[in-house]
From Swiss-Prot:
A Pfam family of this chain: tRNA_U5-meth_tr
Encoding gene, per UniProt annotation: trmA
GO molecular function terms listed in the Swiss-Prot or TrEMBL record: rRNA binding; tRNA (uracil(54)-C5)-methyltransferase activity, S-adenosyl methionine-dependent; tRNA binding
EC number: 2.1.1.-, 2.1.1.35
Entry annotated with the keyword Transferase: yes
Keywords per UniProt: Methyltransferase, S-adenosyl-L-methionine, Transferase, tRNA processing
tRNA processing listed as a keyword: yes
GO cellular component: cytosol
Protein's job: Dual-specificity methyltransferase that catalyzes the formation of 5-methyluridine at position 54 (m5U54) in all tRNAs, and that of position 341 (m5U341) in tmRNA (transfer-mRNA).
PROSITE patterns to which the protein is assigned, alphabetical: SAM_MT_RNA_M5U, TRMA_1, TRMA_2
Top-level enzyme category: transferase
Official protein name in the record: tRNA/tmRNA (uracil-C(5))-methyltransferase
Coiled-coil stretches noted in the UniProt entry, renumbered to this chain: none
Length: 366
């Protein structure tokens, strides 16, 4: 596979291999059959990052081969959204003859949405001044004149110049509802929108008929919390990153949801609060013991759940666990499987044509 060419004819084969691999990994835990969720075979990534290579008067996107480390010119990137692919050549055509905008430009990041909005971040190894801002504003206006709903951001060491705003609003159809999600530049968002929709609908189905309240750790911009709010009396969610918390609060209001409470703290801090180890000013006015959380939702980093959080998670009757790294999921399952059993197992093909697997498990207390 090269960045400019996807082996779409082998999509089914690579998905079957992942299903088999996940089944083998989950066999020791008595897991049920894998429920696979397919990705679009192309244009599935809503974000992309490229280094920029300068070659005389020319400049172009590049990526590096993972094995040989050789640079590869990328004029089109079929893994990325059609919106990103439409913009890529037009953006470079505008940058090439512009010395102010191209000088020491080393990277371009794209974040697009199904709703047609896009953020472009230009990264530099130099100080950005008023001349850069004026040139960037002219570029933004020209691209908007060509029909792009674009936000343009400049970044350099300890500098961020935001011409208008650093966010876009995504709209996802989830189980018959149009869910609005504000996505902030340089913050985590699910890269594959089609798979994200399927993950949300799977999580909704897995928790249908659930009793009591939901606790979510690592909630980000509220991606899962807000969709799952319809299945629970109340939702209590934690997130440590300030931009994500602000986006989550906006998303709560935009979706007119009134039963979700976001707390800005880490999973480790929340564990300490629940155990009474520490008191936190951020929890003033929030009675943790008023929540009857029978279900906990976790979508941890690649490293999985730490030991203390793992012990806390075991205290809940139902555990919904989304993992971007089945190896650390299996490590966690050696502990969780002692108190809970896996009743549902899903494979989400978030990253087609790579060895990466995203999966979900529902565990119920034995």
């Amino acid at each position: 596979m090269t960045p400019s060419m996807l082996p779409t004819e082998h999509y089914d084969d690579q998905l079957s291999e992942k299903i088999h691999r996940l089944e083998q990994m989950m066999q020791p835990f008595g897991a049920p059959a894998v429920q696979p969720f397919r990705s679009p075979v192309s244009h599935y990534r809503m974000r992309a990052e490229f280094r920029i290579w300068h070659d005389g008067d020319d400049l172009y996107h590049i990526m590096f081969d993972p094995q040989s480390k050789q640079r590869i010119r990328v004029d089109q990137f079929p893994a990325a959204s059609e919106l990103i692919n439409r913009l890529m050549p037009l953006l470079l055509d505008a940058l090439r003859p512009n010395p102010t905008l191209r000088h020491k430009l080393f990277q371009i990041d794209y974040l697009s949405t199904r709703s047609g909005q896009i953020i472009v971040s230009l990264l530099y190894h130099r100080t950005l001044d008023d001349a850069w801002k004026q040139a960037a504003e002219a570029l933004r206006d020209a691209l908007r004149g060509q029909g792009f709903a674009i936000q343009l951001i400049g970044r350099a060491s300890k500098t961020k110049i935001c011409l208008d705003q650093d966010w876009v609003d995504e709209v996802l159809p989830v189980a018959g509802r149009q869910m609005i999600y504000r996505q902030v530049e340089n913050s985590f968002t699910q890269p594959n929108a089609a798979i994200n929709i399927q993950m949300l609908e799977w999580a909704l189905d897995a928790t249908r008929g659930a009793e009591g309240d939901l606790l979510e750790l690592y909630c980000g911009n509220g991606n899962f919390s807000l969709a799952l709010a319809h299945n629970f009396r109340q939702v209590l969610a934690t997130e440590i990153a300030k931009p994500s918390v602000a986006a989550a609060q906006y998303n709560i209001a935009a979706n007119q949801i009134n039963n979700v409470q976001i707390i800005r703290m880490s999973a480790e801090e929340f564990t300490q609060a629940m155990q009474g180890v520490r008191a936190f000013n951020r929890l003033q006015g929030i009675d943790l013991h008023s929540y009857e959380c029978n279900t906990i939702f976790v979508d941890p980093p690649r490293s999985g759940l730490d030991t203390e959080t793992l012990g806390m998670v075991q205290g809940y009757p139902n555990i919904l666990y989304i993992s971007c790294n089945p190896l650390t999921l299996c490590d966690n399952l050696h502990t969780l499987n002692q108190s809970h059993r896996i009743t549902r197992l899903a494979l989400f093909d978030q990253f087609p044509y790579t060895h990466h697997m995203e999966c979900g498990v529902l565990l119920e207390r034995r």
